[in-house]
Amino acid sequence: MLRQVKPKNARTKRALEKREPKLVEGAKTAIFLRGNATSQISLDVLGDIHALKKPFSVNFQKKNNILPFEDASSLEFFSEKNDAALAVMATHNKKRPHNLTWVRFFNYRVLDMIELGIVNYKSIQSFSATPIVPGTKPMILFQGPVFDAHPTYRHIKSLFLDFFRGEPIQKLDSAGLSYVIVVSAAEAQEDETKPLPLVHFRVYGTKLLKTKTNLPRVELEEMGPRIDFNIRRVQPAESDVLEEALKKPKTQEPKPKKNVDVDIIGNKVGRIHVDQQDLGNLQTRKMKGLKRSVEEREDSENEEVEIEEDVISDASE
């Protein structure tokens, strides 16, 4: 736990204000760490994922004697020090070779973790496609019903979306959609004794070709990395902590609009309630043909006088 620093000048105050919680969070920073023992394959995969995450990433070069599933206090320290919400750690041993541990934090405390082992790997340098421009926002596609049906694969889907989503934006030019991340898996078997299906991680670059219409024709070219993961240890988030992490501030929730509906076409339909109006004194356009004569006006005035006299006489009786 880092000590709380009181700002002594304006620069320190601005730096602390950047770390304060915001209604709309920006892109999440990820830290990339090496364990006490690593393999070249795990380090190469770590470097390729770091290239996909740039510029919202911090890469550590030194080894760290950290066992995330036994003691995550060091990871939480690095998370708070670097203001990072994500972490990936590369390790290697006889029991779990070529291992990557993916970690998410909430309030600089570990929210959930998952271990993915590297089974097959082909680096970015092995492909001749144009490299990714740092900061480009990817499209993400999950293939297979298992990502909605199985809790572990739902966990992977949520983590990858959180990891690669980048900075939130309102609009995006089609020319900025330069690559797509495809994550696929076969359907999981009901037999729990059998291992879970592999997670296939692919990255494709997009080529926009001219057509006779306004919409371009899209072609995909694999640009790497190409990785096959097998699922190892999983530490899901606790229900109360996850509920707190997913809570939305009241100011972010749009206020419901009364008496406003949207029809099947998408048109907004509103209902207005108006009080009953008194049309007796409504000023209308006067036309000569509708004007009353002098005799008609005198007769109506005499009738009103007679009615008033009758009312007075009834009251006196």
Curated annotation (Swiss-Prot):
Protein location: Nucleus, Nucleolus
Stretches with biased composition (Acidic residues): 296-317
GO biological process annotation, one example: maturation of LSU-rRNA from tricistronic rRNA transcript (SSU-rRNA, 5.8S rRNA, LSU-rRNA)
Residues annotated with Phosphoserine modification: 293, 300, 313, 316
Pfam families assigned: Brix
Chain positions covered by the region annotation Disordered: 287-317
Family, similarity comment: Belongs to the RPF2 family.
Identification of the protein by name: Ribosome production factor 2 homolog
Organism: Schizosaccharomyces pombe (strain 972 / ATCC 24843)
